[in-house]
Amino acid sequence: MIIEEIVGNIANFSDSEKGKHMEKVYLENSDLVKRIQRVTTDHGNEIGIRLKQPIDLQYGDILYKDDKNMIVVDVNSEDLLVIKPRTLQEMGDIAHQLGNRHLPAQFTETEMLVQYDYLVESLLKDLGIPYEHEDRKVNKAFRHIGHSHD
């Protein structure tokens, strides 16, 4: 089976869809940005993904759906630093430092998430900014954004 488009996301399930059998494809965070890949479901079925559109996969994306079954993207947990700045000043300081290192970050209402790096952990300790080292699933890929200093 070759998957060429995402047919929905479980976050938008209707009541009738909640009873369907769900087969999962577990992906590493770095695989969420790959448009073309071969994967194996948790039931041992091999499928190809060749997305027509250049979009990233996300947790809960439905790759295939029929009347009784569906194949859904799940994401393996990631080794993260969960940064919890107490003030706008702390948030600005650490965001500036991480930006200078070109580290991709994700944000919740109260946290900044970055992939674990012992140098960043040392920086957080030195700056006295609260953080936790966790294994956590993230919904989207950490994406590097290219730029130049022209």
Curated annotation (Swiss-Prot):
<dbReference type="GO" id="GO:0005737">
    <property type="term" value="C:cytoplasm"/>
</dbReference>
<dbReference type="Pfam" id="PF05194">
    <property type="entry name" value="UreE_C"/>
</dbReference>
<dbReference type="InterPro" id="IPR007864">
    <property type="entry name" value="UreE_C_dom"/>
</dbReference>
<dbReference type="GO" id="GO:0019627">
    <property type="term" value="P:urea metabolic process"/>
</dbReference>
<comment type="similarity">
    <text>Belongs to the UreE family.</text>
</comment>
<protein>
    <recommendedName>
        <fullName>Urease accessory protein UreE</fullName>
    </recommendedName>
</protein>
<keyword id="KW-0143">Chaperone</keyword>
<dbReference type="InterPro" id="IPR036118">
    <property type="entry name" value="UreE_N_sf"/>
</dbReference>
<dbReference type="GO" id="GO:0006457">
    <property type="term" value="P:protein folding"/>
</dbReference>
<dbReference type="Pfam" id="PF02814">
    <property type="entry name" value="UreE_N"/>
</dbReference>
<comment type="function">
    <text>Involved in urease metallocenter assembly. Binds nickel. Probably functions as a nickel donor during metallocenter assembly.</text>
</comment>
<keyword id="KW-0996">Nickel insertion</keyword>
<dbReference type="InterPro" id="IPR004029">
    <property type="entry name" value="UreE_N"/>
</dbReference>
<keyword id="KW-0963">Cytoplasm</keyword>
<keyword id="KW-0533">Nickel</keyword>
<dbReference type="GO" id="GO:0051082">
    <property type="term" value="F:unfolded protein binding"/>
</dbReference>
<dbReference type="GO" id="GO:0065003">
    <property type="term" value="P:protein-containing complex assembly"/>
</dbReference>
<dbReference type="GO" id="GO:0016151">
    <property type="term" value="F:nickel cation binding"/>
</dbReference>
<dbReference type="InterPro" id="IPR012406">
    <property type="entry name" value="UreE"/>
</dbReference>
